[in-house]
Amino acid sequence: VEELDAPEPLTLRQLTGTLRRALNAVDTPETEREAAARLLHEFATAQDPVAGAAPEQWWGVNPLTTEEALFDAEEPVRVSPSKIETVHRSPLDWFVGEARATETTDLKRGLGTLVHDIAEHMPDADAVELIAELRRRWPSLGMPEGWTGAQELERAETMLRKFAQYAREMRTRHERELVAVEGGFQVLVRDSARDALLTGRVDRLEVDAHGRHVVVDLKTGRHKPTGADIPEHPQLAAYQVALQAGAGQAMQDSVQGEDLHGTDRPERIELPEGTVLTQPGGALLVQLGDATAKPGVQQQDPLDEDQQWARELITQAALLMAGTRFEARHTAEQENGSHGRSCAVPWVCPLCAQGRQVTEK
């Protein structure tokens, strides 16, 4: 195999990068290391200094800007059910997302938002009515005309047909009643290690034939958890803990008017350590965005009083979020996405080549 040399640096900035790499590489001969250090010193002290030449501009050797925790030690940590899995999988992913440093929302996510909004405001409509509303609002997405836009419109129509089928079968086959949409809750989950303020909204709140509340989460993405993941699915489990505290009845009681929407400022409910106030009826994901023709319903069975793992997931998430450092966790395969999930933040992740500091390369 023929070896190819990298092109010579053409600018002072490029040369500075080359010199810094030589200075930090463990296999650089001492004479070359000294020469690189002298040149970098000249670049840094020149009348017009070269950016990046001075050591104080090398992020890899600077001290941490702060080691203060994100939350006051006496305050409960606000935990969203949808973020629990992320912070357990990789605290760094969670932190970067909370800092709003991830990519902006794309058109396909806007499509999912539109489907959610139509389902929220027309929860009992049939497929014809839902699709008519979709086509009326379609131009607001700014989808490109042509084949791509037509494909996305067809996909959105399929999702709404699935939703209409789910809503119909919920009433007729499963004998559940819809009592609230986009209900909000705040549950203070007490724990000796760290209190968590479980805060979120639910797409649909239903009541089963036994009078128990059931949380329904509509999913418009293409990917879904496996059947083996559902019994301990973190987001569904967190919803059930909220129901154990009585959040279901609180959301139902806050409904104002026939549109089934509740208050935007739910009252805080406290769930004391080791107690269950209300028995939930379970929680489920309704998959609308996958490739199947029918809605895929993935249901987590009701939690009983002896299942403390769900509460521990929440309080352990609070501990991770309240830390001063956020660990990057993933396998090497994630960097290239060979197992279906790539690193979400490769530009800052020390486990990825792109995110390593110059002192680590």
Predicted features along the sequence, with ranges:
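RecB-family 4Fe-4S metal-dependent nuclease core
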Residues: 1-361
